[in-house]
Amino acid sequence: MFNFAVSRESLLSGFQWFFFIFCNTVVVPPTLLSAFQLPQSSLLTLTQYAFLATALACFAQAFCGHRRAIMEGPGGLWWGTILTITLGEASRGTPINDIATSLAVGIALSGVLTMLIGFSGLGHRLARLFTPSVMVLFMLMLGAQLTTIFFKGMLGLPFGIADPNFKIQLPPFALSVAVMCLVLAMIIFLPQRFARYGLLVGTITGWLLWYFCFPSSHSLSGELHWQWFPLGSGGALSPGIILTAVITGLVNISNTYGAIRGTDVFYPQQGAGNTRYRRSCVATGFMTLITVPLAVIPFSPFVSSIGLLTQTGDYTRRSFIYGSVICLLVALVPALTRLFCSIPLPVSSAVMLVSYLPLLFSALVFSQQITFTARNIYRLALPLFVGIFLMALPPVYLQDLPLTLRPLLSNGLLVGILLAVLMDNLIPWERIE
């Protein structure tokens, strides 16, 4: 049974959980607004959908899924893949409605597939493909892709087709760098009891400084317009985009196993078992499927939740659920949604950049499980550098590739992960000294 007893400590921890959920969610809608070339008035709707879906996904996991204090939110792998596909295909002239429709179909299929994997228990076997070597590459490349997104947000760069008339505004960028340095300084130099509030302090301080330094910045205007498929619908289907989305959903399952395994140390009384993984996959797939009409980034358990649990020392579901309730209230009250929508993208991007830098530490932890030599280093080096090359390759150079392969091959993160999975599981590296 769940204990609903309220204490001061659990409320404070719940508030910290809210800001963790908030910081990981609020930065996403502005990037979708830019990538899909939507009017500024759509930001309120996208943000409200994001908060609502994320809160419900957290509830689903807390009560029916893994039943642990692990945030369920817009997956970084999904986020990076969707932005990459949209930018690449739009630059080749593919209509935005076609991209949005194909992504919706692919995401729905991946949600169904994730549920089937959960019901069947196949996810445990699928997770075995993600060896420590694969996870090193996964963490490195995911960190590279996400930090690129955050740097673009700090610079105010467009997430869609490049605008030749765009000019970087140095004062806003300087403020975002100052916020980044503030959060880093708190985490590095302050005692742990203060350092754990670095994201919260950085967000609020940057928010206030922004409106003090740039008072002419307009606040969010417009009315809330509830609608299905706000990114676009009714377009032609692209098999390549659908295939890439389905593959992304399969790779995304690795986050489920990484998050649950990483929190086992906090829940020793629960023991090990496949049931928890199965329930979590079903919850993730179900929430991904039913939120397709809201056009939110598909979900996954956040491995970064481990850091918050370590910092706060509070592993209870109660605090996590309190944070999710606050997030739900923000989604249901338009005035609160409007308030949090006004946080500038450069500020939220700077805060999130700091929160994802520890992905490098995660990669180094996985690398300690492997003994690299001059001969077996190729299991990591080849997929890593191929993926980096494809991430930096301008989409125009893939123009002549078949439509079925183009979205996949333009995604360096996915290609690198798939190549690493193949090389690590097909070649007997343990026999190679």
Task: For each feature predicted by the language model, list its residue ranges.
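N-terminal signal-anchor module of multipass membrane proteins
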Residues: M1-A69, G80-G93
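Hydrophobic, small-residue-rich membrane helices and short re-entrant helix-turn-helix hairpins
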Residues: M1-F2, V6, F189-I204, E223-L237, ...
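Membrane-embedded helical hairpins/re-entrant loop segments and their flanking transmembrane helices
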Residues: S7, T31-C64, V246-R317
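Hydrophobic, membrane-embedded alpha-helices of multi-pass small-molecule transporters
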Residues: R8-T25, I168-M180, Y197-G198, Y211-P215, ...
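Membrane helical hairpin/interfacial module
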Residues: C58-G123
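Short, non-helical or kinked segments that cap or interrupt transmembrane helices
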Residues: H66-W79, R128-V134, A195-L200, V296-S305, ...
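Interfacial segments of multi-pass membrane proteins
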Residues: L83-G88, I187, S305-F320, V325-V330
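Membrane-embedded alpha-helical modules
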Residues: I96-S216, S324-E433
